[in-house]
């Protein structure tokens, strides 16, 4: 009887050790992939958090680690250097970066039309972007905002050279509320606008597409040329999981938003539920691809944005559309 107990105990120990070994092996099998957001976590990132929470990345053998930028230019700079394999950025910024020989590549479209609007307190009573001449416009230091603002001011008949542009970092809404800036560009219709409304401010805005700016992709997933060439299977696996997260978000928007709110960085970037609800309702339409799968890209869109930037002398050297993006959605 005593021998039986000893054998049973040994078998139990071996079983537990086997379980622990299998768990460790499973964890070791996952490849860690860092993804840098374009901003702090908000509704546009919901599909990524859903893919993590629902285990879609793990099913593809990936352990996805979401990191935040310390300043608005980090996604482009750190991806170009290879310090970060994946990041969220903006279609025009990818083109501007490539014109400076930075080896960044868009691998998927996330938001298919501009969210970026010029915003100001309604009491300013501006009629068009031409009214910004002689005034101070805040922006987050992201290069794409300059050609956007220049195009808008000139389309409205104003002299862009007489607009004072001031880098306010992430303090976009605060800069117009405090009076530090008369208006801001780089503010999003799905984020700063509902946030400022929630805070009790009456806000007006100009949509860039009404003033000569093309319908560019607001948000794209970027990588660098070397990673795209060497890690194509990882990128494909990443997007398969991201697509599942997106589809689940579309079918279950309320539950998906709860996933985001549960995973928010409340200490540093607290989210407001009603703001994120309004934001997600705006985003769902703008993220949908009517001509193919979520994330799909085409040369025509890239050529249009390249032509716009080139026409306004923002490109340091020519950019070939086909070199600026690589499809991982097929």
Curated annotation (Swiss-Prot):
| Residue stretches spanning the membrane | none
The principal localisation class reads membrane
Q: Which cysteines are joined by disulfide bonds?
A: none
Gene Ontology terms: biological process: thiamine biosynthetic process; thiamine diphosphate biosynthetic process
Q: Name one GO cellular component term.
A: plasma membrane
Q: Where is the lipid attached (S-diacylglycerol cysteine)?
A: 19
User: Has the keyword Nucleotide-binding been applied to this entry?
Assistant: no
* Lipid attachment in record (N-palmitoyl cysteine): 19
- Compartment list: Cell membrane
What keywords are assigned to this protein? Cell membrane, Lipoprotein, Membrane, Palmitate, Signal, Transport
| Gene3D superfamilies with a match to the protein in the record | Periplasmic binding protein-like II (3.40.190.10)
Q: Which pathway does it operate in?
A: Cofactor biosynthesis; thiamine diphosphate biosynthesis
- Which parts of the sequence bind substrate? 38-39, 90, 145, 188, 192
In terms of InterPro entries, this protein maps to: NMT1/THI5 (IPR027939), SsuA/THI5 (IPR015168)
Where does the record locate the signal sequence feature? 1-18
Topology versus the membrane, per the UniProt entry?
Lipid-anchor
Please give the PANTHER family that the UniProt record associates with this protein: 4-AMINO-5-HYDROXYMETHYL-2-METHYLPYRIMIDINE PHOSPHATE SYNTHASE THI11-RELATED, THIAMINE BIOSYNTHESIS PROTEIN HI_0357-RELATED
According to the record's subunit comment, the protein's assembly and interactions are: The complex is likely composed of an ATP-binding protein (ThiZ), a transmembrane protein (ThiX) and a solute-binding protein (ThiY).
Q: Could you say which protein family the record assigns here?
A: Belongs to the NMT1 family.
Entry function:
Participates in a thiamine pyrimidine salvage pathway as part of the ABC transporter complex ThiXYZ involved in the import of thiamine degradation products. Binds the formylaminopyrimidine N-formyl-4-amino-5-aminomethyl-2-methylpyrimidine (FAMP). Does not bind thiamine.
Tell me what this protein is called: Formylaminopyrimidine-binding protein
């Amino acid at each position: 009887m005593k021998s039986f107990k000893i054998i049973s105990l040994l078998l139990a120990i071996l079983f537990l050790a086997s379980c622990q070994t299998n768990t460790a092996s499973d964890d070791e099998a996952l490849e860690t992939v860092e993804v840098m957001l374009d901003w702090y976590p908000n509704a546009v990132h919901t599909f990524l958090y859903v893919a993590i929470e629902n285990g879609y990345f793990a099913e593809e053998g990936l352990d996805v680690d979401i990191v935040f930028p310390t300043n608005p230019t980090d996604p482009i700079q750190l991806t170009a250097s290879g310090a970060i394999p994946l990041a969220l950025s903006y279609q025009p910024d990818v083109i501007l970066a490539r014109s400076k020989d930075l080896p960044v590549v868009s691998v998927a479209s996330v938001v298919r039309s501009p969210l970026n609007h010029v915003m100001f307190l309604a009491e300013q009573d501006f009629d068009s972007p031409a009214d910004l001449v002689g005034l101070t416009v805040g922006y987050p230091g992201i290069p794409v905002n300059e050609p956007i603002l220049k195009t808008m001011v000139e389309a409205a008949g104003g002299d862009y050279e007489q607009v004072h542009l001031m880098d306010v970092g992430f303090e976009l809404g605060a800069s117009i509320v405090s009076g530090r800036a008369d208006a801001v560009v780089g503010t999003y219709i799905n984020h700063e606008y509902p946030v400022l409304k929630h805070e009790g401010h009456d806000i007006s805005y100009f949509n860039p597409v009404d003033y000569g700016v093309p319908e560019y992709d607001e948000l794209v997933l970027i990588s660098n040329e070397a990673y795209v060439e060497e890690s194509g299977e990882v990128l494909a696996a990443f997007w398969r999981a991201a697509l599942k997260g997106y589809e689940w978000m579309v079918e279950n928007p309320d539950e998906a938003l709860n996933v985001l709110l549960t995973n928010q960085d409340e200490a540093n970037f607290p989210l407001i539920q009603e703001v994120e609800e309004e934001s997600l309702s705006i985003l769902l339409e703008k993220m949908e691809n009517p001509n193919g799968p979520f994330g799909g890209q085409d040369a025509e869109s890239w050529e249009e944005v390249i032509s716009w930037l080139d026409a306004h002398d923002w490109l340091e050297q020519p950019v070939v559309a086909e070199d600026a993006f690589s499809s991982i959605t097929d």
